[in-house]
Every structure is written in structure tokens, then in C-alpha cells.
């Protein structure tokens, strides 16, 4: 028997329990992997708390790294002993071992260790679709990024800088401001004491920005629209402060024929070939050193409840990994 973090009811971190599970053998098209490291993401809190309802009891986590133990029939591109990682897969990463569709697994290059991989897959693939597909960031762009010191934020700001863009980041305090500045943000706004709409206008000389990447949601979204140039894109990819209130679409016309999108990784990575192409770009920018993955906190997997509490309290910065 192996162990996993599961929850039988929604609620706070206290609903997470460490229990024995029977993993079983992989079926057709599946692989069994033994985790070495698991990524922590804010979406895990949404799932645990019931914001995104799941059938219960449920496992948790969509990002991890480890070693293939066994493959099912029809799996030809993986074998036992392969180092793999994933970030676009069914939930269940908070476990010592699990079964997973083999086409969701990505072989890791030798240059990327397991802890780094577990910290970068979901977040890095999210950044890939945001800046390479949702709005294709190009040299000369000035962009606005909320939560710039978070796991996604640190990767996005570095990658966008690598592409030749100027990144304006918002953060909650001076410590996070320093971190964002060190990881690609040319300008940092501490939203607790500055009006980010006014500052964006000042920084851009009134031109505003072509895209806002917003994972905060309720507290920032409407003001984010005021930062966009005509025909600009508001990419809402999270809601750490709560869901955005219903919006009168006429507002988008008034503010300059704006576009609003609520993209998800599962949509962009639905096809195996799309997932592999996205991962190839991610692995290249990390291996080249253009993007550095900063694992700033680690917890034992069995202590996932503590990790959730710290993440919700905004005590963490960068990426957090649960070690198995």
C-alpha cells in the first residue's frame, strides 16, 4: 500500500488527510509513476475548498515529477525507469504513487532535476500558453502582470523579458517587490499603497498596455481593464481574491473594444502533440538559463495542510514543492 493526501469533504486545510491507498496496475494507455516531488498551486486550494467542485472523496494536485514504475498495454514511448513530469493531467499528484494517462507524461531532460520539474510544469505550461498563445508577447511590448512574485509570475516575467518585453508587475509588499524586480520586472507596483492604474499610465506615458495577465480576479479585474490600450486583451487565469462579478459587456466597448478571455491549461494542452510542443518550449527556456525556477519553500507531502495554510495566507513566494 502507498499513501496519498485526500479529502472527504470540502473546507479549510484541515480537511486534508494522509491515508493508505491502493494504486493498482496500469491499464491500457496508462503508466504507474512513483513521485519524488509534487508541485503546490493555488488551484489546489480552489479544489479543496469547493470553489471548483469535485466528486468526493478526491485526491488533489495536478503537477508532479517522478519515475515510471510500470506501463500498460499500448504504451510504447515510456518504459520503467524513465524520469518524467506532468502539469496537465487528472488530479492525484498528492500521492506517493499514482496511475496516469501516459500521453500526459513528459520525459525530463537530464538538465532539469525532479524538484525543479515539479515546481515548473503546471506553472511553466501556463506561462507558455499565456505569453505564446493567448496573447503572443513580442519584443517592444510593455505588459502588466498581477501577482508578479508568485510561482507563475516569476516565470512569466523572466520569459517575457527574454522575449524583449518590458514587464510591469504588481505585488503586495516590499519583500515581494524586490523578488519581482530580481526576476524580470522592469517596474514594480506595491498595490497596497499605490494606484496601479495611475502608475501604469505614468510608466507607459499614457499609452497603456496591450495585455494584462490577471490571476487575482475580483480585487483587480475592473481596474485592469482601465490599464488596457484599445483592442487590448485581459487574460484572467485565476481568482485568488475571489471570482469576478458579472460584467456588462458594453463596458468593453466603452473602454476601447477590449477582449476578455478566461483561458485554461486543459484547453490549450488537450491534444498530446500540443502538450509536447508547449513543454519543448518550456524545457528550452529553462535549460538555456533564460528562465530560472525558484523553489523557495519545501514541505513533506504528508504536511500538505500546512503548505495550503501558508499559501492561502500569502506567506509564500515563488514556487513551493511537496517532497515525497
Task: Indicate where each model-derived feature is located.
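Glycine-rich beta-strand-centered segment in the early N-terminal region that forms part
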Residues: 22-39, 49-92
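NAD(P)H dinucleotide-binding glycine-rich loop of Rossmann-like/cofactor-binding domains
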Residues: 46, 86-149, 159
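Short glycine-centered segments of the SAM/dcSAM-binding site in methyltransferase folds
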Residues: 83, 142, 166, 232-233, ...
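Hydrophobic/small residue at the entry helix of a nucleotide-binding pocket
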Residues: 152
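Adenosine-nucleotide cofactor-binding segment
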Residues: 161-220, 271-273
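Glycine-rich phosphate-binding loop and adjacent beta-alpha segment
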Residues: 171, 219-290, 324
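C-terminal hydrophobic helical "lid"/dimerization subdomain
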Residues: 272-324
Amino acid at each position: 500500500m502507498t499513501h496519498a493526501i485526500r479529502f472527504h469533504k470540502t473546507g479549510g486545510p484541515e480537511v486534508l488527510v494522509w491515508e493508505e491507498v491502493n494504486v493498482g496496475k496500469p491499464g491500457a494507455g496508462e503508466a504507474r509513476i512513483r513521485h519524488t516531488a509534487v508541485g503546490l498551486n493555488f488551484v489546489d486550494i480552489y479544489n479543496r475548498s469547493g470553489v471548483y467542485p469535485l466528486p468526493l472523496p478526491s485526491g488533489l494536485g495536478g503537477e508532479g515529477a517522478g519515475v515510471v514504475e510500470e506501463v500498460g498495454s499500448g504504451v510504447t514511448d515510456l518504459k520503467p525507469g524513465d524520469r518524467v513530469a506532468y502539469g496537465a493531467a487528472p488530479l492525484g499528484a498528492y500521492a506517493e504513487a499514482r496511475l496516469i494517462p501516459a500521453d500526459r507524461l513528459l520525459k525530463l531532460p537530464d538538465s532539469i532535476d525532479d524538484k525543479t520539474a515539479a515546481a515548473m510544469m503546471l506553472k511553466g505550461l501556463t506561462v507558455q500558453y499565456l505569453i505564446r498563445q493567448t496573447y503572443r508577447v513580442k519584443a517592444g511590448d510593455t505588459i502588466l502582470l498581477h501577482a508578479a512574485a508568485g510561482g507563475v509570475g516569476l516565470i512569466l516575467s523572466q520569459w517575457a523579458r527574454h522575449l524583449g518585453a518590458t514587464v510591469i508587475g504588481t505585488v503586495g509588499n516590499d519583500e515581494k517587490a524586490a523578488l519581482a524586480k530580481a526576476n524580470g520586472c522592469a517596474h514594480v507596483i506595491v498595490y497596497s499603497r499605490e494606484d496601479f492604474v495611475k502608475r501604469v499610465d505614468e510608466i507607459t506615458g499614457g499609452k497603456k498596455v496591450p495585455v494584462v495577465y490577471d490571476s487575482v480576479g475580483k480585487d483587480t479585474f475592473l481596474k485592469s481593464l482601465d490599464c488596457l490600450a484599445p483592442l487590448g486583451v485581459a487574460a484572467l487565469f485565476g481568482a485568488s481574491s475571489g471570482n469576478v462579478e458579472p460584467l456588462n459587456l458594453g463596458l468593453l466597448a466603452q473602454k476601447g473594444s477590449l477582449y476578455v478571455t478566461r483561458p485554461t491549461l486543459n484547453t490549450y494542452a488537450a491534444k498530446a502533440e500540443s502538450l509536447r510542443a508547449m513543454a519543448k518550449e518550456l524545457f528550452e527556456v529553462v535549460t538555456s538559463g533564460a528562465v530560472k525556477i525558484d523553489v523557495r519553500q519545501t514541505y513533506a507531502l504528508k504536511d500538505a495542510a500546512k503548505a495550503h495554510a501558508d499559501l492561502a495566507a500569502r506567506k509564500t513566494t515563488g514556487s513551493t514543492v511537496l517532497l515525497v
